[in-house]
Amino acid sequence: MPHRLTSFVLAAAALLVWTGTSQARVTKIVIDNKTSPAFCTGSPPVCPSFGDAGQYETLTGRAFGELDPYDPQNALITDIALAPRNANQKVTYIASFFIVKPIDMTKASGVLWHDVPNRGGRVTITTDLRAFGDIGVSSGWQGDNAVATAVPANASSPTPVTPVNNEWVKTPVLSGVHGRIFGRIINRSGFGAAPLNVMGNPIPYFPVNPMSNDGATLTIHTKETVNGFVTEAGTVPNTDWKFCGGGTFALPAPVTTLPVQLCLKDGFDPAKLYQLVYDVTDPYVLGAGTAAFRDVASFFKYEAQDDATPPTPNPLAGSIKWAIIRGSSQSGNFTRHFMHLGMN
């Protein structure tokens, strides 16, 4: 029988146990794919057992949820008051999830590791945790990365969608709402167009007017310290750059798809950082993704079934004693933010 520091697990769980709320909840789940047994290799397939827990299976699916924008636990979400509502006057979301669990749930340990995906990357609990009978859930929270967390076109379909190997969340979009953001371009050279990024991800918003850069400010920076202090080396005149969808300053392609790019008259210098402050339109209510992460864990820990007709049973019902969030790097930043908002 594997051994671990039970007291450590209990202490961590005590700090990070989700509490249920009637004003924010998953109302429906759809299981898109089930592999049982899982982790098989070879031909004919050999399917491993893990300690006393035996064989495992995986489930891929989607959670449909709704948020009461007036509930204090949700009202702290930026711009939720502006979000579109459903017939119940709730704000909705759809989040993907991936479950790793024992086939025989009587062998489950009661510990659920709710892993935070890093830029959409799916997380699978390791073999040592499977040997304990632990359960793993990876679910979507990031609604603004158009690459690894791109939302499937048929995400709202009540029928199964083709499984993908990443996590995503569909959050509300504020149509017609404008706001100011900044983006960066680094390590680029030459006269070709360069995409606007933030933290390595393409910015998923269109400028209010892609044909004009009025009101936008493009600055050049030569140094940045570890504590974020940036040395400004000047401002690029608006006559010397433009929004584009590719090409060059002299022959720009129109802005029709994301990510939005910049074309620079004098070209880009790889030794410099370019930072643009500009107005965009149709932002996401990104905090709904944070609430979705909260609600998915709450559903799997507390609920017996969803609200659909006929209802879909919770595949983890009655098996979870402790739900523990964890993450590192970007996922660690999310975990800290999650706890700071009081969503655990």
Per-segment meaning from a language model:
Residues 1-9:
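Bacterial N-terminal signal peptides that target proteins for export
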Residues 9-18:
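Bacterial N-terminal signal peptides
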Residues 18-24:
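Sec/Tat signal peptide C-region and signal peptidase I cleavage site
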Residues 24-344:
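C-terminal His-loop and adjacent cap/lid subdomain of alpha/beta-hydrolase
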